[in-house]
Amino acid sequence: ASIIDGVAEIDVLNRQEAYQQSGYDLIDRLHAYSECAISLYALSDEEQLRASLAESALVVNATNVGYPDDPGCLLTADLLRPELIVADLVYNPRETELIKLARSCGCKTVDGAGPFVQQAAIAERLWLGREMPVDFVMETFFGE
């Protein structure tokens, strides 16, 4: 089973034209796991951005925007609505500008700490053949 099983459609909004081919490569890899319809658009296409967000249940920032060396937020308040779930894969800082904005708009939010730790757990399993104590790590480092 795939994490995207049951998802009707995914819109990927690419912020840099130089990575357009990488976007298509990602779509090809995702199709190996799911029959989900996946489309690639330019983030700079504001009309498409608005249309995509209007139909979305989940928004995920998978860029480096939000880290200390690339601060900021790619979305504006007028694009968000309270029923959206907004996830930011940036884990430092925990409360990125996107997370702050989404909370102020009434959205449910997911910060990057969980995905960061889960990625580390997968790496530990693959490389070292052991299970990382995810709950302990989350409690120790993130107070969760």
Which residues are covered by each model-predicted region?
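Generic secondary-structure signature for well-ordered alpha-helical cores
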Residues: D28, A32-E35, L58, V65, ...
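Adenosine-phosphate binding glycine-rich loop
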Residues: L89-E144
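NAD(P)-binding Rossmann-fold cofactor-contacting core
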Residues: G6-S34
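Short, charged, surface-exposed secondary-structure boundary motifs
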Residues: Q21-Y24, D69-P71, Q119-I122
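Rossmann-like adenosine-cofactor binding region
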Residues: C36-T109
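Active-site-proximal catalytic alpha-helix in oxidoreductases
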Residues: A1-I3, V59-A62, F116-R125
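Conserved S-adenosyl-L-methionine
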Residues: I3-E9, S104-K108
